[in-house]
Structure formats: C-alpha cells, structure tokens
Amino acid sequence: MIRIEKLTQSYCLNDINCTLPSGKLIGIMGANGAGKSTLLKTIAGILPLKQGEVWFDNQPLSNMNATEKSQHIAYLAQNTQIHWDLSVYDVIALGLAATLPKEKERSKIQAFSEKFAVTHLLDKPFQQLSGGEKARVQLARCCIKESPVLLVDEPIAPLDPYYQIDMMEQLQSLTPQHTCVVAIHHLSLAYQFCDEIVLLEQGKLLAVGETQAVLNAENLAKAFHIRAEIDPMKKTISKIEKQ
C-alpha cells in the first residue's frame, strides 16, 4: 500500500492525500500540467519531498536510502532512451545488479524475456526494434528488479493502437503480485484496464477511487472540459467531444 499525506510540490502539487492499494493497476490522470509526472517522480523519490510524506506500507520515503528505494520501487520514465549500442539482452541486464553471477543473470533474463515475449529479440540491437518492441524490452528491464511497486510515466503515448493495448495488458498482468501506477492520457484504455484512478486538476486531487466511480461525466467535465458517452457494462468511453 502507498499512502500519500499532505504532499505539496512547489507550484505543481497542492496538499495531495490519498491511498493506493497494493496489487492494483492504478492510473494517474489529468489534463496537461495537472501534475501527473511530478506526482510519479515524487513517489519514486526522484524529486525531493518539499512538504508531506509518502509511505510504503509503514515505511516513510523520507527515511529510505537509495538502496531501499531501488528495492521497493521500479520507475520507467516517459520516452526513456538507450543511447548506447546494446543488444536487447544487454538492455534488460541493466535492470540487474552488476554483482549478480552470470549464470543467475542469464536465467533471470531468459525468464523475463519469455514473460514479455521478447526472447526472439535478445540478440538483436535494441536500436533496430520498433517502438512497441522497445516498450516491451524497457518494461522487462524495469520489472526484472522484481520491486513490489512499478511506476510508469506515459508508457503508451508514443505507441500505435496495437501496442497501446499490448502495454496495458502487460501492466495488468503484473497485478496482483505488484502494484502498478501509470500516468496515462488515454481515457478509454484507462477505463478498460485500470482498477483505480487518481484524478488531478491543476495540481489538486479532484477524485480518487475505483475507475468507474472516478471517471464519470461530472469529473471528466471538470478535469478535461469534455463530455463523452460512458458505458460501465462494456467498460468503454466513446464519442468524446469538447464542451
């Protein structure tokens, strides 16, 4: 469980209080500039706490050292780039400790490449992959740490529709063994895949809770200035238009 108490970050976040349950796929949503990335980076410990606290179960983030943060949290930034000439195997290996024996390294990489369906790509140069293939490999790199919490910033933004769905399916498959928190703009995919939503409006918490309760007509109008057709039975949001 992640508990956020009275979290304030400069001009980006203002007195955020919420609890994110363990083992769920949780979407962080809001218009551009609402504070989604800032919230993720603060939970990850990348941005220092200015005011308030983030708790992982009963452990405060402010008391965790770099090793403890790495053990608890895996973070995948938006548009993460690999600039070196590495194979897919080498990229996934970046998520492992350098001191891990080679035999264990090979075993773990084989297991996680199978999990994310990239085994056939292991010897291929990472830079030659498609955007969707790169996304899978990057997710495997993060998940191979086996941290209980995975934070992902806008993972589907650069992907085509097939790989957008694929990425959400991959994240969903990690629950309930892991808690996955993802910043996401895509309303219909968030509505379909996320268990819960944290909805931000101009740095403030507008709503938090089960997806169908949060992504209702009133909240969509407040957060995004749009109207849409919502079908809770089919888990779809369609016919989105400006107010």
Language-model-derived ranges and their functions:
Residues 29-31:
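The feature captures the beta-strand-to-loop junction immediately N-terminal to the Walker
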Residues 44:
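Helix-to-loop junction immediately C-terminal to a conserved catalytic motif
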Residues 52-60, 69:
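Conserved ABC transporter NBD signature motif
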Residues 106-121:
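Conserved ABC ATPase "signature" region
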Residues 125-129, 133:
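Conserved ABC ATPase signature
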Residues 150-154:
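Catalytic Walker B motif of ABC-type/P-loop ATPase nucleotide-binding domains
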